Amino acid sequence: MRKLPVLIAATLAIVPFGPADAQTRSGTSVLMAESERGRQFQEEYGFSDAVIAGDTIYLSGIVAGLAPGETDMKAAYDRVYRHIGSILKRAGASYDDIVDMTSFHTDVEAQLKPMSQVHKKYVTAPYPAWSAIGVARILGGGITEIKITARRPQAAADSRL
């Protein structure tokens, strides 16, 4: 049934997350979802919110989906950018620390403008590198999936000493 995967994807995009839950993995820190439901989903599929390796933060792809009855893509993108911000914060970074972004779109031409409008609300110049790619489908019926790479500001400052 298609409604359940959409609900799961939409729920994961808006579930609030608390402080970082770091686990050691060969010299890296792994951030898992704080909510039981989010953690179960991640454990079922074998992924985390983010991995911190040295001064680099790798966020897993985060799915933007329309809520039931919703037609405004900006609302979906606003939810996903807030989620991205919460993960970055848990990793010790902010939107200013994003260095690379890849977005996967089910309709890149229709989705790029509303996403860009929301993107600029959170990410200011100088902008990170960004690749937007068209795809046939996204897990759970999502409209866009966003993958982020960021640099931890303290680690960057430490490397200059």
What are these regions (language model features)?
Residues 11-12:
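Repetitive helical segments and hydrophobic/amphipathic motifs
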